[in-house]
Curated annotation (Swiss-Prot):
Disulfide bonds: none annotated. The keyword Transmembrane helix applies. Residues 1-10, 93-110 are cytoplasmic. This is Movement protein TGB2. It is found in: Host endoplasmic reticulum membrane. Keywords: Host endoplasmic reticulum, Host membrane, Membrane, Transmembrane, Transmembrane helix, Transport, Viral movement protein. GO terms for biological process: transport of virus in host, cell to cell. Pfam families: Plant_vir_prot. The chain crosses the membrane at residues 11-34, 77-92.
Length: 110
């Protein structure tokens, strides 16, 4: 052997992965919260997304808004699902009393 070999710990990618996952999650949340799912009604100059009536000399548009009973906002359900899963992960991660114990048998090894 020509010299002493030094052991180096592997690169920790935890913080960049956490930052990327938070960024992607926020982007998806903003996209789903701000997109319009209402049907497009009208032409390129006259849009009636919330209902209404437009009468011109050559055309007439009558559209009544979608009823609130038919459309449901998925945002509260998604928020509740994320909150429940986060609480479950937190509960299960704190449930282990000794983080240095063996996951197979539960006893600490040297």
């Amino acid at each position: 052997m020509s010299g002493a070999h030094h052991l180096t710990p592997p690169t920790d990618y935890g913080k960049p992965v956490l930052a990327a996952s938070i960024g992607i999650s926020l982007a998806l949340l903003v996209y789903t919260a701000t997109r319009s799912t209402l049907p497009h009604v009208g032409d390129n100059l006259h849009a009636l997304p919330h209902g209404g009536r437009y009468v011109d000399g050559t055309k007439s548009i009558s559209y009544f808004s979608p009823s609130a009973s038919k459309t449901r906002d998925p945002f509260p359900f998604a928020f509740l699902l994320i909150l429940t899963l986060s609480g479950l992960i937190l509960l299960l991660s704190r449930r282990r009393s000794n983080p240095h114990s063996c996951p197979s048998c539960g006893t600490p090894h040297a």
